[in-house]
């Protein structure tokens, strides 16, 4: 064990945590030829199109086991489902290059959520109602095992409406071809108070107790952001309900809404169209302000409305699906294993010029099982179990003691492609620093101000990953523990400020708080999956999840990156169990698939 904490010197952060200046701002309305969910200002900043991709750069940063096409641009997941033995992942895709535009529905299939076969696009821009783009949508499986896609299309004037498509041949196990309904669009924003350029991203449909289908669509109604509610007898003819499923005055337009049922303390998934067990809750998710937020509540069947358990006017305090580079998520009920799975889009945080040099841009996070915590207050997430099939070369350590300033190197795993699970046991909780509730408004700012180099009572402790030999490049994923009047609060941070020597990158310090009963359980868990330029971390059993994109030069030096466990807090931290694996490369859209062409 080395006393080597000197590498974490204080870092100049000049606005690195000021999200209003540091991050691209997601906006509403038509954008760069269309907008259908999860687009932002950076999409318009396109570099010259005649730049040739660099194989070396593409290989250095391209992931080994995350979902992404073989080349070109991708963004939102759209319509994931399990059908006749295959998982289907549709996604927003530009077949013509690694920049936003010409959006169609990419399509891949898998039997295990890990290895994917890339197919021809399922939907392309070829009708008046979607000539501007085949934007985000969902898949619903109708009675009799009939899948139907409902998606947002933009016309030549960029007005948005909802369209439907059916598989041409349901006996085709891959469902390669889809036929659009002759009466598209089936749903227009033609009622008073609606905004025709803020009407998109329909949810999966569900059947109510009256036998009618329901569906929510993101939109604006009389200046309110809303999940607009519609009903239908046949999934073709829709009528707007007089009131939204839920609305809010004061937030930006809600993109990519999602609505599903969950059971407290039970990771079994629920089909919203089936009978919902007693005691179940409902989650309403919306993509807004560059992040994915959600509320927990109940679905009032009499009112046909979502009622949150806690009404929070300040949207900065709304719960988050992920505290990092994660947007436009989509979930589905996996009937194969009786679980709910969620994906999100993780955009690049370098530049459009870099994307052209790489020849690709964007990826989807590892599929996650999502369920409700025992206390019913928040959602928990964990990578699907199938990803563990890529684990190899396990190393394990027990009984590590980390005093202030200690580093423990985790050797004999590929530091570029690794899965690390570690538990931190607190010998004492008496040294916890006091908690300031105002920090909840901007945990990223607090992570930036109290970085891993600033000692605390309990913490920071965690992992240093993708570290170069001399530590001039490294990323820190860590915890700090605070004591409020009645409970303990844990801050989880993913600090990218020294992740790369390159100056032209977004390098924030992401962060989120979660409550933890340290009187009952003294061990805080951390799982971090490292996949070259993508890092996903799950803290406290999935209470806080942070997706980060990093571009260190050390990725060019095979075998030269390092992983460490560390502690820089006054209180000693014990590691009862540490396990790490090298992750094998998955086959993602490269074998005999259209996307590999």
From Swiss-Prot:
Alphabetically sorted, this entry's keywords are: Disulfide bond, Glycoprotein, Glycosidase, Hydrolase, Signal
A single GO molecular-function term is:
fructan beta-(2,1)-fructosidase activity
One Pfam match: Glyco_hydro_32C
How's its activity regulated?
Answer: Inhibited by sucrose.
List GO BP terms, alphabetically. Answer: carbohydrate metabolic process
Q: Which residues are glycosylated?
A: 169, 237, 249, 568
| Reactions catalysed | Hydrolysis of terminal, non-reducing (2->1)-linked beta-D-fructofuranose residues in fructans
Q: Which cysteines are joined by disulfide bonds?
A: 447-493
Active site residues per record: 76
Cleaved signal peptide residues: 1-15
EC number(s) per UniProt?
3.2.1.153
Which superkingdom does the taxonomy of this entry point to? Eukaryota
Which InterPro entries would you find in this protein's record?
Answer: ConA-like_dom_sf (IPR013320), Fructan_Metab_Enzymes (IPR050551), Glyco_hydro_32 (IPR001362), Glyco_hydro_32_C (IPR013189), Glyco_hydro_32_N (IPR013148), Glyco_hydro_beta-prop_sf (IPR023296)
| Annotated family | Belongs to the glycosyl hydrolase 32 family.
Please name the PANTHER family in this protein's record.
BETA-FRUCTOFURANOSIDASE, INSOLUBLE ISOENZYME CWINV1-RELATED
- What role does this protein play? Hydrolyzes inulin-type beta-(2,1)-fructans. May play a role as a beta-(2,1)-trimmer during graminan biosynthesis.
What protein name is recorded for this chain?
Answer: Fructan 1-exohydrolase
